[in-house]
């Protein structure tokens, strides 16, 4: 579901889709170009121009699309978030890539996800690719957005004495609103 995707990121996605289809006979590949939808969305909301808002809107448009495809196929939406992203630092878009029905790898650190990929025979090109959400026009990757590598985040999450622990806590604090239950107003009877 490319939305104004950087060519190298899109090409890598196509490589992975091709590998999946060849390896697993039950995989269907659907290329859904989302540029027109996003362009219309951006034009309607042009007076509310905000780069970060548009990046998150891309994730939310993808989520809505995934739920439509799932509904049409009597299916569910499967998440791709890992423990560092989902529970460590909240590195996902609320109601975007965080909007899923099940999250099978959410208890795995990123290093475990890479290890699992190798075990399953996933191409090293894909495993070694710089992680990115693909939501930014400039092609920024996860490390650039987070300011830390996944290896450093994992170490900091597991060890309060790690030199990056405070930085990890700062990132986490900024995103707790995504990981905590939605605040509600309660009334006494």
Protein language model regions, located:
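A generic local structural motif
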Residues: 63-65
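ATP/NTP-dependent adenylation/nucleotidyl-transfer catalytic domains that generate, transfer
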Residues: 4-5, 20, 24-37, 43, ...
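ATP-dependent adenylation/pyrophosphate-handling site
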Residues: 1-17
């Amino acid at each position: 579901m490319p939305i104004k995707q950087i060519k190298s990121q899109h090409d890598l996605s196509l490589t992975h889709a091709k590998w999946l289809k060849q390896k697993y006979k039950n995989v269907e590949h659907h290329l859904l170009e989302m540029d027109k939808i996003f362009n219309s969305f951006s034009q309607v909301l042009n007076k509310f121009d905000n780069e970060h808002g548009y990046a998150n809107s891309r994730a939310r448009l993808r989520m809505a699309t995934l739920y439509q495809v799932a509904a049409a196929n009597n299916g569910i939406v499967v998440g791709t978030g890992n423990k560092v992203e989902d529970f460590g630092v909240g590195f996902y878009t609320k109601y975007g890539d965080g909007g899923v029905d099940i999250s099978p790898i959410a208890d795995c650190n990123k290093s475990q996800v890479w290890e699992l990929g190798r075990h399953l025979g996933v191409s090293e090109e894909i495993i070694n690719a710089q992680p990115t959400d693909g939501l930014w026009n400039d092609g920024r990757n996860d490390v650039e957005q987070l300011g830390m590598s996944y290896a450093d985040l994992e170490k900091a999450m597991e060890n309060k004495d790690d030199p990056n622990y405070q930085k990890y806590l700062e990132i986490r604090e900024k995103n707790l609103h995504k990981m905590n239950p939605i605040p509600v107003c309660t009334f006494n009877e």
